[in-house]
Regions:
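Hydrophobic alpha-helical transmembrane segments of multi-pass integral membrane proteins
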Residues: 1, 180-189, 212-251, 255-256, ...
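Membrane-core helix-loop-helix motifs of multi-pass transport proteins
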Residues: 1-79, 92, 265-268, 284-325, ...
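Transmembrane alpha-helix interface/packing and boundary motifs in multi-pass membrane proteins
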Residues: 11-15, 190-192, 226-239, 268-276
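Interfacial loop-to-helix junctions that mark the boundaries of transmembrane helices
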Residues: 43-55, 92-98, 125-141, 211-215, ...
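Juxtamembrane interface elements at the cytosolic ends of transmembrane helices
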Residues: 63-86, 114-124, 142-162, 288
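Hydrophobic, small-residue-rich membrane helices and short re-entrant helix-turn-helix hairpins
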Residues: 82-99, 124-128, 154-176, 297-306
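Core transmembrane alpha-helical segments of multi-pass membrane transporters/permeases
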Residues: 130-200
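Helix-loop-helix junctions that connect adjacent transmembrane helices in secondary transporters/permeases
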Residues: 194-219, 226
Length: 346
């Protein structure tokens, strides 16, 4: 269970395919670019970190697996089990609901594929990069999960009418209240930053200082990653942190000649590993509750965190080394995205 949780949290945003997180962070990055250079047409795409994240998926799997075998399992010993575990049986109606949800998903994905290959969702000359499909990935995913959930609910009998749907949505959103409130203040913070031009002033001052002291290149990138890791202990939401960081660090790194997609990538590397043990994450308390209910009733939060910390530190070090090797080899991080800005942007 710990390994699965670490893979989902510490390896967060490392995917084989472009995900909603890519679109979310890319939007915040482009907002920072626009605030810094209002007249520019330059922007990053949702695929700006794609190549690196594909490779990172395998890196995270190997590192977390190695840590589990050599560091975590020897400390915990062999789990014998209570022998009283009971699984809820899936009813025939629930099976019908799952079948309906699966068929709905297939039909919807087929429709999206047709719209892409027929033209409306494709980019210029049929390109995938920069296409309306990628720009609209979040609403596309929202509709997918919404119609699948509705199909399952009505066929399985969980939903009788629209009031049941409203109640289910309200129940799920109840736990998101603190996040929505935090996003509100992040939006106000970002708006004030753009209005006062404080982000631009900090970016210019910071870039001049770093250039004068010669603190650029790999040391700068590693320092930025470690800063993101430290802040992640206190603010676990990746989008909330990037909403605060992007207006400052995207322009600052652009003034030093670095591509915004590369800056975003450094942030993502620092944002992920410590997710698996920070007490500020609601998920660690959820996994503790599940572990106490199903496996180890006397498990404490300290034991869980103590086993997560070594794994996160090893992954953070491995990920930084992997990035440095990638930089030295000069491999693109995504389609058309390298370390430095294209000529003529600044």
């Amino acid at each position: 269970m710990m390994v699965g949780y670490a893979g989902a949290q510490a390896g967060f945003t490392a995917n084989l395919m472009v995900a909603g997180t890519d679109t979310l962070l890319q939007g915040l990055t482009n907002d920072a670019i626009k605030a810094f250079m209002p007249e520019t047409t330059f922007a990053v795409d949702a695929t700006c970190n794609w190549f690196f994240m594909i490779a990172s998926t395998f890196l995270c799997s190997l590192v977390i697996g190695w840590c589990s075998v050599h560091m975590i399992e020897p400390r915990l010993g062999k789990y014998e089990g209570s022998g009283n575990a009971k699984l809820d049986e899936v009813t025939p109606q629930q099976k019908k609901g799952l079948h309906a949800a699966g068929i709905t998903a297939l039909i919807y994905m087929a429709l999206i594929a047709v719209l892409f290959f027929m033209g409306p969702l494709a980019g210029e000359n049929g390109k995938f990069v920069g296409s309306p499909f990628l720009k609209g990935l979040i609403p596309i995913l929202f509709v997918l999960f919404s119609i699948c959930g509705l199909s399952y609910g009505y066929v399985s009998g969980s939903f009788k009418n629209i009031n049941d749907v409203n109640k289910a949505m309200a129940k799920q959103m109840a736990g998101m209240g603190s996040y929505v409130l935090f996003c509100f203040f992040c939006g106000q913070f970002q708006g004030l930053f753009n209005w006062t031009k404080l982000g631009t002033l900090l970016a210019i001052g910071g870039a001049d200082f770093l250039e004068n002291v010669g603190f650029t290149g790999i040391p700068l990138c590693v320092a930025f990653i470690l800063l993101c890791s430290f802040v992640n202990i206190f603010v676990s939401s990746g989008s909330a942190k990037w909403a605060i960081f992007a207006p400052i660090f995207v322009p600052m790194f652009m003034l030093l000649g670095y591509h915004p997609g590369f800056t975003q990538l450094c942030y993502r590397i620092g944002d992920s590993p410590f997710n698996c043990w920070t007490p500020m994450s609601a998920y660690i308390w959820m996994i503790l509750s599940v572990a106490q209910t199903k496996y180890v009733p006397n498990l404490k939060i300290g034991t869980l965190i103590a086993n997560m910390i070594p794994m996160s530190i090893v992954l953070q070090i491995a990920w930084i080394i992997f990035l440095v090797i990638w930089m030295l080899l000069g491999i693109p991080f995504g389609p058309g995205v390298g370390i430095y800005l294209p000529a003529g942007v600044m």
